[in-house]
Amino acid sequence: MGRLLVLLLLGAVTMTMAQTIPTMETGGRTMPDEWIDKDTGHRVIKLTRRGGSNVSFYFHNNPFVADEMVFRGSDVEHAGNDMMHGAGPKRRTQMYAVNLKTLDIRQLTNEPYNVSTEIVCPATHEIFYQHEDSVFALNIDNLRKRTIAVMPKELRGGIVTVNADGTLLAGKLDDPEERKILGEHPKKSEFFRLIFDARLKKTIFTINTRTGIMDTIYSERAWLNHLQFSPTDPTLLMFCHEGPWHEVDRIWTMDVVKREKPRLIHKRTMYREIAGHEWWGADGRHIYFDLQKPRGETFFVGKTNVYSGVEEDFELQRSEWSVHFVSAWDEKTLAGDGGSKTSVAHSPEGQWIYFFEYDGPRLKATRLVNMKNHDYKLEPNVHYSPDQHWIIFRANFEGVENVYAVEINTGCFSPNRF
């Protein structure tokens, strides 16, 4: 009898909480801090409850340290294309952190210049950022800042990733010819082909975060991009051959200590096949990627074991294709951010935040958030919350950029959100 009473009380509390959360269309107006998407039945909450514009990280960059998520915030509202480095009105951008248990927000950086970084090391509780030729680390617990290195004039470049134990940063050297092309042809539709065809010499470098020593480790006459250190192996770096995806074997890895010949992760097998938007699985054993065979016709998520080379491909519907996919921390499920009608899949029904489960050689999709009021010029870039109960994404469906989380399972209504 006592156990039944407890169950009834819990049920009553759950129903009461559910009734206090409004069910409504997502976006197209100012939203409350919490609501239930009327088209999916899933609960959505706003994580960045501050003024200005707030943007979470690119899909493969880990923003989580302990109970906090690092994000970029500015004092200017702008609902346009922010992507990775910011655009639109002049703004003062700094780094912030939101506590995923309390939703309290604190400012991490307060520089006289804009700070827009996505380099976070959970192992050392540091964020790394750069201003002109100087590279800094900031401990997010005590906010102590240290200078790591000042780049020599002959070796200027940009840092983009940190290794698993926080001892190495990696980036690419600047190229004057590439800067010239970008200056003369600022539209991606113009510069993308021009830089690819130029076959400029590109160089990857590392910086030791303890000694500040900068070392060039690999050069090639190819457009090297999207550097990502393994989340578990401090010496293993992934990079891509940028360019039109159907013309490049894109995804490569190399050991930054042994400096052996880079290893190709996926080789194209047919005309107009593409593989890209690659990311590391959390265990560091697999690299995942968007795979289309051929482009715009048949859609998969590919998964390659970096040690054995064994690849598995999982098919999904055209309408379920996403600009970016991401794997859960336990790698048992996937999520995706959907796409607009003008995206690669050209699906009129693709504007959703998706949750995917494996079903043999296919992926079974669940729609979590209707994104019809979101402008996909700002890519949502999904992340799993550390407890894997929520999918975190960025959106402009209120008319300003903010960061949100949608609950994967319906009907929980737990007061302990994360």
Pin down the residues of each PLM region.
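Short, conserved, GDST-rich strand-edge loop motifs in beta-rich repeat architectures
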Residues: 20-27, 73-90, 171-199, 240-248, ...
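Blade-level signature of beta-propeller repeat domains, shared across WD40, Kelch, NHL, RCC1
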Residues: 379-418
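Asp-box/WD-like beta-propeller blade repeats and closely related beta-sheet repeat scaffolds
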Residues: 110-202, 216-219
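Beta-strand-rich domains and repeat architectures in extracellular enzymes and scaffolds
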Residues: 21-34, 39, 43-93, 227
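Loop/turn-rich, solvent-exposed surfaces of beta-rich toroidal or solenoidal domains
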Residues: 281, 285-302, 310-364
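Hydrophobic beta-strand positions that form the internal "hydrophobic ladder"
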Residues: 69-71, 126-127, 168-169, 236-237, ...
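Blade-loop segments of beta-propeller domains
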Residues: 53, 57-60, 76-132
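Multi-bladed beta-propeller domains
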Residues: 35-55, 98-114, 140-155, 206-223, ...
